[in-house]
Design a protein with these regions (language model features):
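Glycine-rich phosphate/diphosphate-binding loops and the adjacent beta-loop-alpha structural elements
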Residues: 185-211, 297-304, 330-336, 367, ...
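Structural motif
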Residues: 116-117, 291, 322, 359
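N-terminal signal-anchor transmembrane helix
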Residues: 87-118
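Electropositive, gly/pro-rich neighborhoods at or near active sites that engage anionic ligands
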Residues: 1-97, 145-263, 421, 434-452
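Active-site gating loop/helix substructures
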Residues: 235, 239-298
Length: 453
């Protein structure tokens, strides 16, 4: 259609282009009157005649004043027309953005140039963290464990022969730039007595995409495009793996869902097969990261399993990224009974084989008695921060008030994101540029995060 398409009715652009042109003409007339330059002869002659008829004399000062007036009005019309023209275009190209245009542009530019953050873990703890990460950077990669063998994920794993999609779904949803309706849809679990009962729609969706695209990695990429995910979600391995735990009494328990049931103390985690290879992108994400974050999440069944995959442990040690561990706020029955924050850190170090952490973020907020009563029956207790003991390992401890205000004792993604933003800003990991403006970027990001429910 070419330039003729600009003349089509209903595109809501011509009126603002015309208004802008009127503003340009008024500015030109104002300049001509001010400098007494015969730019628009007929128009200026008419103004001179009107001035003479009104005042009875020709006043150069009055003509100059009129020129200034035309200049101001013309400039105002140009500005208004430009703003409405840009708003009209933006409302079509980016229809779901709220807030001012400049704020949107600034936030998107900053997020695109944000630090490369790789988060290693799984379970609900990881998705909680990712909800805050997407307001820090678009360069976030979640390396997710694929050892789940229970619930909907376990059924799909057995029936379709795919890696369990549950933790992958939670991470995709957490990073998605989506409407609340899409989130509810992805997390919807079928009810009743049908064969679909207990299945999560998001799990079925990912399984369908994996088959349609010819593999789980391609399926995850396609799902990310549909959900407009800010970042990437990659499985730690695409192989069919099983977790094993050697207990302190020498017994071995197989299966991620079975390990907590025996209620014994875990000595070491293992994986079957022991030589399972890392998925494409997992090792690259670790080696190319500016920040490596471990947790929060189940220590032995969500975080450590990633470190058992061939190549990932070595990549973690070799990575030059700042390495941060986020400790849980409550012990997990059957996994970390009686553990403090130091025990969590030491377990990570033992499975990697060397002290590799730079920072440990621990909760310093007390749990209310009302909240504790809900956990008494299952034996879950608040985790002690163990600040001095962790520091003795050469790790910088960052204590913070991290517990959410609801009935469940868990990390508040907003509080956690605020701590991470402050730490990353202090380490000057936002890249080159004027670090002064990062302060305003962080404030804008936190405002958006606190609006989330």
């Amino acid at each position: 259609m070419g330039w003729i398409s600009w003349l089509c009715p209903g595109i809501n652009l011509k009126r603002w282009l015309l208004l802008f042109a009127v503003g340009v003409l008024l500015c030109a007339l104002g300049l001509a009157l001010f400098f007494n330059y015969q730019l628009m002869g007929k128009a200026e002659e008419l103004l001179f005649q009107m001035t003479y008829l009104t005042t009875g004399r020709y006043s150069n000062g009055l003509i100059m004043t009129m020129g200034v007036g035309f200049l101001i009005v013309g400039f105002a019309i140009m500005v208004y027309g430009t703003r409405r023209l840009i708003s009209s275009v933006v409302s079509v190209v980016v229809p779901d953005k709220n807030g001012s245009l400049m704020e949107t542009i600034f936030m998107q530019r900053k997020l695109t140039r944000g630090p490369a953050i790789t988060v290693v873990g799984g379970g609900t703890g990881l998705s909680t963290l990712l909800r805050g990460m997407k307001y820090i950077t678009n360069n976030c990669t979640a390396v997710v464990t694929t050892a789940d063998d229970g619930g909907s994920s376990g059924r799909l794993r057995k029936e379709l022969g795919i890696i369990p999609p549950g933790d992958l779904r939670n991470c995709l949803t957490a990073l998605a730039d989506r409407e609340p309706l899409m989130e509810r849809l992805m997390q919807y679990r079928f009810q009743g007595d049908s064969p679909l009962a207990g299945h999560c729609f998001g799990n079925l969706f990912i399984a369908a995409m994996a088959q349609a695209e010819g593999g789980m990695e391609a399926g995850l990429n396609a799902t990310s495009q549909i959900l407009k995910v800010r970042g990437r979600v990659v499985p730690s391995t695409l192989e069919d793996i099983r977790l094993q735990a050697r207990m302190t009494d020498g017994s071995i328990v197989t299966g991620e869902s079975e390990i907590p049931k025996v209620r014994k103390h875990i000595k070491k985690m293992m994986m079957l097969p022991a030589d399972a290879q890392a998925a494409n992108g997992a090792i690259d994400a670790i080696l190319n990261a500016d920040v490596l974050i471990f947790g929060p999440g189940s220590l032995y069944t969500s975080v450590i399993p990633n470190l058992l995959v061939e190549g990932i442990r070595d990549a973690v040690v070799r990575s030059k990224a700042v390495k941060i561990y986020i400790c849980n706020v409550m012990t997990q029955p059957g996994e970390t009974d009686g553990y403090g924050a130091y025990d969590h850190v030491q377990a990570l170090i033992d499975h990697v084989g060397t002290q590799f952490l730079d920072y440990a973020i621990v909760n310093s907020q007390d749990v209310t008695s009302e909240q504790l009563r809900q956990y008494d029956a299952e034996g879950s207790r608040p985790i002690k921060p163990d600040i001095d003991k962790i520091r003795s390992l050469g790790i910088t401890v960052v204590p913070a008030r991290l517990i959410s205000k609801d009935d469940l004792v868990r990390h508040d993604p907003r509080k956690l994101a605020r701590v991470l933003i402050a730490l990353i800003y202090r380490l000057r990991l936002f890249g080159r540029g004027m670090q002064f403006f990062d302060y305003f970027f962080m404030r804008a990001g936190m405002k958006k995060l606190y609006k989330q429910k």
